[in-house]
Amino acid sequence: MSDEDYALFEAHPQATIGGCIKIEVFESKQTGLRGMLVQTDEPLCSLHVVLATEADTNDWSHKDDGLPHTLEHAIFLGSELYPFKGILDKLANRSLADGTNAWTATDHTCYTLTTAGEEGCLNLLPIYADHILYPTLTDSCFH
């Protein structure tokens, strides 16, 4: 990240795993969004975007209606800037990725991407983020 990018985030204390794998945690000053950077000496670069989903059933909740799981699939149908079904996987394949993937658990949904080298992940991150934050969500998504 550039110095300008770092100015948008607050760095938290670093940690290490096994004395050799450094973990850096950053938090957006504007949104509170947290990101972790784990650097390893491997040829693959993995991206995991994890969003909290409703885990409680109460008077105002959706009572297990499957909405988080439906949205998990719907984001792959396009976004505001990239309104094309399957464009993420097509672009990911250009970065020697095995496509994109996601899963929904009780309390979170995780979107993943693994590419050969960091350049692919960095190039796809804004496109993936647009799909996650601004999906097109047309009626056809729910039929």
Tell me what each language-model feature is.
Residues 1-88, 112, 126:
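His/Glu-rich zincin catalytic helix
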Residues 64, 73-143:
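Active-site-adjacent, His/Asp/Glu-enriched structural segments that form or flank metal-binding
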